[in-house]
Amino acid sequence: LRCLVGSEMCIRDRYMTETEDPDRLMKICRASSSMPLVTPMVNIDGVPYLDGGLADSVPIRRAQKLGNEKIIVILTRNQGYRKKVISTAVQKLYRQAYKSYPNAVRTIFRRSFIYNKTMNYLDQLEKRGEIYILRPHVKPVSRLEQHPDVLHAFYEHGYHLMERKTEEMLKYLEQ
């Protein structure tokens, strides 16, 4: 298991692995799924971490750099989705919450630009047949969604989408 986490100390995203210590592995997993302003930073080896997705939401270039020739990207947002710039009011919240972590604040503020640039790059790769993307065809659920019926319906959509796309995906992998 390789988790992407972001550290104030590292400034950039960082990939962490753990094969020996289950408690440390749990901390890495918690950090890689943390939500700014909602969950606290996770201390790993004395260093505070947030979700590395703040620095690189879809690490496609990392996958390519590692030499992966067949890449399947699973997105949680519909075709064409782009992140909006954070409002001034929310920027103030981030500045206050992470005033001791200016690099984290800068990373959070740049996130929409980096994300949107990555989505444009993914669109180009997909058009050229260089990657395979699975994405929902229905409205995605909120990150804070708690209603079991809504979550189950989105899960079912993903399950049936995968059933329909399996053959197409296998053709991509075999070419």
What function would you assign to each model-found segment?
Residues T17-T19, K27-K65:
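ATP/pyrophosphate-binding catalytic subdomain of soluble kinases
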Residues L1-G6, C10-I11:
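Single conserved hydrophobic/aromatic residue that forms the stacking wall/gate
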Residues R2, P22-R24:
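Short Pro/Gly-enriched beta-strand edge/turn motifs at strand-loop
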Residues E8, M16-P22, G53-Q175:
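Non-catalytic peripheral regions of patatin-like phospholipases
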